[in-house]
Amino acid sequence: TNGDSDISVDGTTLTITPPANYNGSEDVTVTVSDGVLETSESFNLTVNPVNDAPTVQDVAGTTAEDVDFVLELDGTDIDGDELTFLASVSANGSASVSGSTLTVTPDADYNGTLEVTVTASDGQGSGSGLLTLEVTPVNDAPVILGLEDQTIDEDTSLTLDINGLDVDGDALTFSATNGDSDISVDGTTLTITPPANYNGSDD
């Protein structure tokens, strides 16, 4: 018998199992009996401490496209050791840790799921958890490609093919305005007709 440890005897084999994460000293009393009389002896059992690796819980988070996600990390170490943290992203982003503050930066214009592995270390052992980060889409404004200054002669029209890019893959429509010239857009074709006898510069 003893205090909190689990003790079993099988024939002449004594097995002692201390509680999880226990360390310290305890007395064990062994009794032998012949069915009529019994004798007891005690001995002291010392359980030496060993390092227990920290743990990090799995968590989930949400952020918008092109917006950093910031989280205060919280690991558990039953030994009370000071923890340091590291983080890595499987793809489509990057992660950095300052103290216990995690910052996850999705790649530009990315939306979808990021998996971030967070590791806590106590200097002797480590444990990891997974942050599942959902990056929600936002609309990105389209851009016009290859539009440069143009020169034409008086009393002539200018026709240009205009091109745009939308990273979201949305269908694009074009329009154009200026001062006194007549402007029309047909699909991706821009036609500019200055007034008769006009010369000069137009924006």
Model-based region annotation:
Residues 1-52, 62-141, 148-203:
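Acidic, turn/loop-rich segments in luminal/extracellular domains of secretory-pathway
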Residues 56-58, 145-146:
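Short structured motifs
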